[in-house]
């Protein structure tokens, strides 16, 4: 086809106009989108209200007004771009409507501030059924009417009830009263979370389950099958990142084989947009036990061929104590635990050497924690959020260590 001079000029202007529009619209410009999505996530863990309510207890602390707007603004102004949003399955069962509405609201406010959220399906001591005082996680209907894991019998890794329950969980033997297995039930719940927030630009991914318990050598492969099942189910409803977590307990001298090779067995078979999350609660100084653990996690990520994500980090002091079962365990000493500006800077510099997918400090919560350096924010009687000295320490370290650092 032969074009006239006018036709050539028109075609040139049309191409120029389309290019200009694409450069201004991230959705039309794949290069811009790639740069945006490759930005390292740096931020904090965060708890909400209805999304973290245990079934066996309620919160005594009032929920601050404009909690999300205040929080996200402070986090954004502090030079961070990320929130690992901690929620619990049993919180959904307790109040499904309030749970979903809070998720929607949090995602909308995160959009406003340009933050990036990973939604973390969390558990601590398995469930409030096993630990009514402190536990939260799996819903009560997965424990009822079974003498192996009676109410209040202990959900931490050292308790026989927790060992029994997690063993049945990995064998896919936990069911509801209708006989539907727990893996399927959990996938149905996670899909509800995805359908609620997946369309939001602030949503970058979903964590299958935070820090599941492993109690025997044969369970590593079973965790891999579980992660594969959940990841495959989530892939049916989202193209965003899927995060799988390290297990607990993390004792390098234990008889269950806590090493990079076994950790890599937990990786989902489909590694598309898959991330390995681990936690660090100490200074990984040269030659230290924490450095040995950190190196193991990095090696596990390398063996799996997936990026690593430091989904929780802080600095704590642990004491060796005897629990109710007569076993030695290490528990956090609230009085001795602390993190200094020097500690924070050293940890962030170490992270920069690793160049991870991202990291999230533990943590941002409207309820005060007995470990002082776990408190990034407090609230006054009027509901105004007030960052603590630990947020200032984190903010200043981020600014000094990451100044001038752009996209990866």
Residue ranges and their predicted role:
Residues 4-24:
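Sec-dependent N-terminal signal peptides of Gram-positive bacterial secreted proteins and lipoproteins
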Residues 16, 33-36:
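Acidic, histidine-bearing metal-coordination/catalytic regions of metal-dependent phosphoesterases
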Residues 20-33, 190, 243:
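Signal peptide processing junction and immediate N-terminal pro/mature segment
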Residues 37-259:
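Active-site mouth of glycoside hydrolases
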Residues 60, 64-65, 175-357, 375-383, ...:
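Extracellular glycoside hydrolase catalytic/binding regions
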Residues 361-366:
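Acidic carboxylate-rich catalytic motifs and surrounding loops in phosphoryl-/glycosyl-chemistry enzymes
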Residues 368-376:
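C-terminal catalytic histidine-bearing segment of alpha/beta-hydrolase fold enzymes
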Residues 393-408:
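Short, low-complexity, Pro/Ser/Thr/Gly-rich segments in the mature regions of secreted, periplasmic
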């Amino acid at each position: 086809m032969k074009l006239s001079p006018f036709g050539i000029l028109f075609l040139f202007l049309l191409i120029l106009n389309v290019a200009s529009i694409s450069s201004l619209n991230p959705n039309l410009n794949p290069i811009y989108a790639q740069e945006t999505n490759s930005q390292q996530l740096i931020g904090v863990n965060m708890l909400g209200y209805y999304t973290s309510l245990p079934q066996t207890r309620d919160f005594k602390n009032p929920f601050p007004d404009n909690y999300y707007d205040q929080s996200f603004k402070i986090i954004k102004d502090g030079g961070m771009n990320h929130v690992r949003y901690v929620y619990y399955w049993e919180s959904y069962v307790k109040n499904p409507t309030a749970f979903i509405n809070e998720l929607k609201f949090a995602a909308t406010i995160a959009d406003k501030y340009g933050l990036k959220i990973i939604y973390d399906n969390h558990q601590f001591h398995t469930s409030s059924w096993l630990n009514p005082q402190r536990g939260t996680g799996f819903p009560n209907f997965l424990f009822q009417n079974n003498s192996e894991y009676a109410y209040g019998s202990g959900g931490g890794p050292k308790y026989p009830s927790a060992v029994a329950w997690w063993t049945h969980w990995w064998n896919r033997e936990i069911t509801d009263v209708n006989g539907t297995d727990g893996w399927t039930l959990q996938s149905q719940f996670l899909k509800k979370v995805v359908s609620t927030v997946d369309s939001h630009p602030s949503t970058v991914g979903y964590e299958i389950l935070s820090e599941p318990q492993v109690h025997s050598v044969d369970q590593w492969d079973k965790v891999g099958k579980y992660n594969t099942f959940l990841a495959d189910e989530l892939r049916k409803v989202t193209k965003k990142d899927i995060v799988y977590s390290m297990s607990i307990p993390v004792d390098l001298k234990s008889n269950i084989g806590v090493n990079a090779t076994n950790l890599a067995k937990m990786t989902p078979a489909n590694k598309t947009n898959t991330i390995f999350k681990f936690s660090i609660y100490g200074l990984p100084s040269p030659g230290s036990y924490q450095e040995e653990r950190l190196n193991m996690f990095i090696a596990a990520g390398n063996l799996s061929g997936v990026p690593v994500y430091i989904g929780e980090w802080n600095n704590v002091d642990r004491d060796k104590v005897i629990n109710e079962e007569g076993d030695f365990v290490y528990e956090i000493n609230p009085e001795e635990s602390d993190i200094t500006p020097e500690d924070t800077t050293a940890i962030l510099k170490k992270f920069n050497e690793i160049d991870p997918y991202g990291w999230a400090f533990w943590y941002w919560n409207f309820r005060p924690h007995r470990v002082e350096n776990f408190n990034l924010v407090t609230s006054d009687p009027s509901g105004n959020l007030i960052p603590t000295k630990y947020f200032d320490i984190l903010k200043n370290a981020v600014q000094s260590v990451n100044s001038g650092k752009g996209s990866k």
